[in-house]
Amino acid sequence: VNSRRSWVIFGIGVFAYLVAVMQRTSIGVAGVAATERFHVSAAVLSSMAVVQLIVYAAMQVPVGVLIDRVGSRALMIAGTALMVVGQVTVAFAPTIALAIVGRILVGAGDATVFTSLMRLVNSWFRGRIVPQLSQWIGNIGQLGQVLSAVPFALLLHESGWTTAFLSAASVSVVALVGIVAAIRDRPVGSSEGPRPATWRESIRQLRISLARPGTQLGFWSHFTTQSSGTVFSLMWGLPFMVFALGIDPAEASGLLIVSVVAGLIAGPILGLLTARFPLRRSNLVLAIVGMMGIVWALLLLWPGTPPLWLLILVLVAIGIGGPGSLIGFDFARTSNPLHSLGSANGIVNVGGFLASFVMMFLIGVALDAQNTAHTVAGLYALDSFRWAFAVQYVIVGLGVVFLVRARRRTRRRLAEEEGIEVGPLWVALVDVWRRRDGRGPGENVQ
């Protein structure tokens, strides 16, 4: 472990994930083109992305179980091949129905890559570098969004729908070759590989993973932090910027990169904080959620057209939410044995995408409900988006309630099993201040 071979596998795996993110987000920058190509309403258009995410989320637990049974390599090969077929289907789709079928295949293939890669990292690396590598997976992977926002969007604009989606499919072919050639499930001699088991035994292990409070805490952490950015980048961000704010489509696609850059900067910092203060990871999650809530409120309540700097602030906030969601997988890592980590990661990964497709669909419904004139201008009006985007507060607020409950149970189990008491953050900060001020021994902020 932690060898040169480990880094080769990490690099190829991250490239495969980057390509998967590009395939996932390609429909976001194609939203306007899809409206013109298929002549459909906002709700129908959103269903193309929603169905993709439903499939992605529904596949997470089965994929996690299969990773524990047959290994990451087989799942990554099958998933990447599915994405090739899916994007080719979208490229030639004459109707929205066939395009949705293609996106279903993309969602099914995409579902295998990230969870498989997280398991590979835990098999090939050890120590405090693991949570930092998890952040780098998310950060580098999000460069796939840059590929969809810039070269893919330009190709879509210049060469058309079919050429753009066929080109995207060809990149997955390259990733597939790399996976077949280099990815292996575990180091030679390791006993921590896939474990053949009956489905009854696999389901029993899944239930055990799901029952662990730390797994549930990871689920709700992912639920609350990832969804806003996914909804914006995958579906509603481009129509909002182009129609509601009057931004040029090419410039709007470029602005989506702001979120990626913010995530690239924040990810390593969050990785270091996660490794340094493992008992305060939930405080990081809640701080990120609070920050996103504040900047969204500023944007939605701004009188008139919001200024560009405020839009950029929102993009930065949701960009930080991306690496923030990866903290959920660190909860799974520290709460589950390696042989069942695939199942636990699958459960966690459902969270953000479950929130995303519910939020995405409800925003589409809210936009349609306000479009009494039945025009594109009315559909994507600024005031319509204000009310539609407010749906986020309901979904994320529900997630925060369950997150706090799961944290309470996780800390209770930590106290019972390991004798570690985690007090409120403000108490720990006061103790640290007293220690530095020489007034007392203080308590570790962890």
What are these regions (language model features)?
Residues 27-28, 213-268, 357-364:
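Extracytoplasmic gate region of multi-pass secondary transporters
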Residues 58-97:
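Conserved MFS/SLC helix-loop-helix module at the cytosolic interface between two early adjacent transmembrane helices
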